[in-house]
Amino acid sequence: MPVLTSSSQPRKQHKALTKAPWHARRRLLTAPLSKDLQRQLGIRRIPVRVGDTVLILRGDFKGTRGKVTRVDYKRVRIYVDSASFKKPSGEAVYYPIHPSKVVIVELDQSDKARVAAIDKTRKAREAKAGVREVITPQQGGQS
């Protein structure tokens, strides 16, 4: 979870979360990618969007796979089409799930800007990893 305040006091932590601006809340809506997607895309986590397919890891709907139908920035919750229950009237109610309790198994890649951002992040990670591998202890570097 991103750091919104340096205080360890619960009241200040709660206030920082409830008063957080939308661009900070977007970072709170980040979920990890599946191992296959991590290898394929070269990144570990990404903010959840409508249309992504997720696997629920915790709670009553554990093991359920479905598409994200809604992302609630105010409550920092996502709604998955397969995580719902029926009211006595027959109306379906979607259950709110925290994004940290899901793993993204399939990305919605219809947005070109999102794909470009993923590529940019992957290239930056590869460049950073390449810099680390330049001098190793076996090559005469200090350990």
Curated annotation (Swiss-Prot):
GO MF, one example: structural constituent of ribosome
Protein name: Large ribosomal subunit protein uL24
Family annotation (PANTHER family): 60S RIBOSOMAL PROTEIN L26 FAMILY MEMBER
Biased composition (Basic residues): 11-21
Record organism: Caldivirga maquilingensis (strain ATCC 700844 / DSM 13496 / JCM 10307 / IC-167)
Any single GO CC term annotated in Swiss-Prot or TrEMBL for this entry: large ribosomal subunit
Pfam families: KOW (PF00467), Ribosomal_L26 (PF16906)
Keywords of the record: Ribonucleoprotein, Ribosomal protein, RNA-binding, rRNA-binding
CDD domains xrefs: KOW_RPL26
Function summary: One of two assembly initiator proteins, it binds directly to the 5'-end of the 23S rRNA, where it nucleates assembly of the 50S subunit. Located at the polypeptide exit tunnel on the outside of the subunit.
Segments of skewed composition (Polar residues): 1-10
Family: Belongs to the universal ribosomal protein uL24 family.
Keyword rRNA-binding set for record: yes
Region called Disordered, residue ranges: 1-21
